[in-house]
Amino acid sequence: MLRAASIRLFLCGDVMTGRGIDQVLPHPSDPTLHEPCIRDARRYVKLAESVSGAIPRQAKFDYIWGDAKAELDRAAVDLRVINLESGITSSQDYWRGKRIHYRMHPRNIDCIIAARIDCCCLANNHILDWGYKGLAETLRTLDAANIAHAGAGRDAAEAAAPAVCDLPGKGRVLVFSYGSPTSGVPWEWAATAHRPGINFLEDTSKKTAHYIAGEMRSFSQDRDVIVASIHWGENWGYKLTDEETGFAHQLIEEGIAVVHGHSSHHVKAAEIHNRRLILYGCGDFLNDYEGISGYEAFRSDLTLMYLATIDPQQGQLLEARLVPMHVERFRLNRVGEADARWLCDLLNQLGAPLGTRAELAPDHAITLRSSRG
C-alpha cells in the first residue's frame, strides 16, 4: 500500500518537438534547415510517412502525446517532468558549426501545455541551437505558459537554480538540470556570470558529484525531494562506464532522490540503489526519426513512461512503474505484449549487474525491483 502523502513523478527522456514534429503542428516554423543532407524540415515528415503512413497536418496540440496522455491522467501523477530538447523560438540565428538545429514555433507551446507538463529540463545539446536570442525566447515562452524550467538561464546562477515545484499537502520537489559534454553539449554553451547558457557539468567524477550534491542541498528544505536530471552519454550503446555508475551512486548516497539520465536515443539501464532510483538513459520519448535507418537493433521506436512514487519523508522509492509506448506517426501509442516483453527482457539484462530486476504485468506495465533486498 502506497502512503497517502507519497509523491508520484512522471519522468521521460528527450522530447524533441522541433523540426518534423513542429511542421505537423498548427503553427509550423520556417522549415529551412542548415543540415549537411536535409535542408527542409518537411522532409522528415515525408521520411516518417514513407514507413508509417500518413501523418495529419495542423494536428491538434495533444496529437503527439497519443495514448500517453490518458495514461498520465489515470496514474494520478503529481509532477510531470520532461527533458525538452528543442528551442521554442522563431529566431533565425542558428548556431554556426553545429550540424543539427531543433526549434519549435512559440505558438506551438500549447502542445506542451496539452500534456500538462509541469517542468522542462533544458540543459541539453539542442536548447541553444538557435542562439542566445532563441534561448531567451524559449525561457520567456515557458514563463508565459507557467511551466517551470531548470538548467538554462541568463547567467550561471539562473542556469544552476532548481525548478521549485510546490505540491500542496505533500511538499516540494526540486528539479536540477545538468548538461554534460559527453552528450555533445558544446563547452561554449556553459553559462557564466556574464553570459547566458546552460548548467554545464564539466565531468562525472565522484568529486564533482559530491560538489553538486552539496549545491543542490543548499537550495533544499527538510523533506524536499531532489531530482538531478542529467543529459549525458552517447546517443547509441548500452555500456555504462565505472565513472558514470560511480557518479550516480555518489549522488544517491548524498541524498538525491532520483537521478534522471537522458541523451541516448534508446532505453538504457535502470537501477534501484539504496532504495532510490537511477535512470541511466530514458531514451527519446518523442522525435522525428521515423524512416531514418541504421540503428534498428536498439528499437528506439520503443520508449518508456517512468512513474516513480517517492516517500518525501525519506526520499526513498516506493514504486517504479514503467509504461511502454511505441512512437509511430509522431505519436505515442500503447504497445502489445511482444514489445512490452522485449523492453522488460532488456531491462533485466541491463539491470542484473546492478542488482535490479524488471517484472512484466498483464497490462504490459513493467515494475522495477531491487534484487538485493
Describe the role of every protein-language-model region.
Residues 1-373:
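Acidic, metal/ion-coordinating pockets
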